[in-house]
């Protein structure tokens, strides 16, 4: 079986919340994609409940695109501690951390239920599993800790 980089990361050594570049790859036509680890809570110490995480996912899908160019996808980790962010080109972890911070701030302080996209049976495969209250509370807690541009040393932006 192929080795997956995310499973070789020492999850006991990282200090969440942080942004980490997992990989940067160049396609056969020269296009560059980057995969970032947006770790919101400390692995094996916490996990965001699915309803809150699901709502954060839907909001990040739009807000990150408002904050930075080149967003392809932002998908939650199965362990519920953060997200993969896939982008075109070569953004720095600091650029991504700033976009993430701004997006989480919008969720925590500016978002109302009407702002959450994809919350009906036609636009979401699990539309009943959302909580804006949970999303806001988790985002406030994450922002209070500060988002680091480095996974191993706290370099809060």
Swiss-Prot record:
Q: Which cofactor does it need?
A: Fe cation
Transmembrane in keyword set: no
Highest taxon listed in the record's lineage: Bacteria
Gene Ontology molecular function, alphabetical: iron ion binding; S-ribosylhomocysteine lyase activity
Q: Which reaction does it catalyse?
A: S-(5-deoxy-D-ribos-5-yl)-L-homocysteine = (S)-4,5-dihydroxypentane-2,3-dione + L-homocysteine
What protein family does this chain belong to?
Answer: Belongs to the LuxS family.
The protein here is known as S-ribosylhomocysteine lyase
Against Gene3D superfamilies, the record matches this protein to: S-ribosylhomocysteinase (LuxS)
| Enzyme Commission number(s) from the entry | 4.4.1.21
Keywords annotated in UniProt? Autoinducer synthesis, Iron, Lyase, Metal-binding, Quorum sensing
Q: How is the cofactor bound?
A: Binds 1 Fe cation per subunit.
**What SUPFAM superfamilies does its record include?**
LuxS/MPP-like metallohydrolase
Root EC class: lyase
**Function of the protein:** Involved in the synthesis of autoinducer 2 (AI-2) which is secreted by bacteria and is used to communicate both the cell density and the metabolic potential of the environment. The regulation of gene expression in response to changes in cell density is called quorum sensing. Catalyzes the transformation of S-ribosylhomocysteine (RHC) to homocysteine (HC) and 4,5-dihydroxy-2,3-pentadione (DPD).
Complexes and interactors: Homodimer.
Please provide the Gene Ontology terms (biological process) for this protein: quorum sensing
Residues at which Fe cation binds: 54, 58, 124
Q: Specify whether Metal-binding is a keyword of the entry.
A: yes
Alphabetized Pfam families for the sequence:
LuxS
Please name the taxonomic classification of the source: Bacteria, Bacillati, Bacillota, Bacilli, Lactobacillales
